[in-house]
Amino acid sequence: AKQAGANEVAVFASASETFSRKNINCSIEGSLARYELVCRKAAKEGVPVRGYVSCIIACPYEGPVTPEAVCRVATSLIRMGCREISLGDTIGRATPDHVTVLLDAILEVIPPEKIAGHFHDTYGRSLDCIRTSLERGIRVFDSSVGGAGGCPFAPGAKGNVATHEVVQMLVTEGYSTGIDARALQKATSFMEQILGRQP
């Protein structure tokens, strides 16, 4: 990856055993063992690693996921050297109440500056979940141009929350994003054309 010009790598873990096996073809423990080797090698090469935890609220196969399960995986990733942990609501089931309970647990063991939010907009609640995360001190959020994305092992789940919607909400609420709104609009229109969506 470094030879190809990548200046950061990502590792994808899951708080759900079944989703881990479906998505990356190994157990949670097996994935963490692999990622420890990745983090060790990345540290030697001076390459930062970002950790992702899927299914932080619910799993499409197992149902509800406990905050304790999420904390176990997230803290393992931090201990092995991940610079930041992105908490992924893979199937978009999160509500603000879910996010509050989870962050109350996570922030006991990991500081907010090492946490990012990753919300899918399956049920139209992602912006509310971001607002709740902001109240808890989270300042980094994943999004995608035009709301594109998804996962073949998360049936029915929509893509990530749309970048332009997140930026509009943040600006309205007084946050600075550093994002060029005009360039973002062009990128969004381009993506909607590719996906065959009406603007």
Placement of each model-derived feature along the sequence:
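Catalytic cores and adjacent flexible loops of soluble metabolic enzymes
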Residues: 2-199
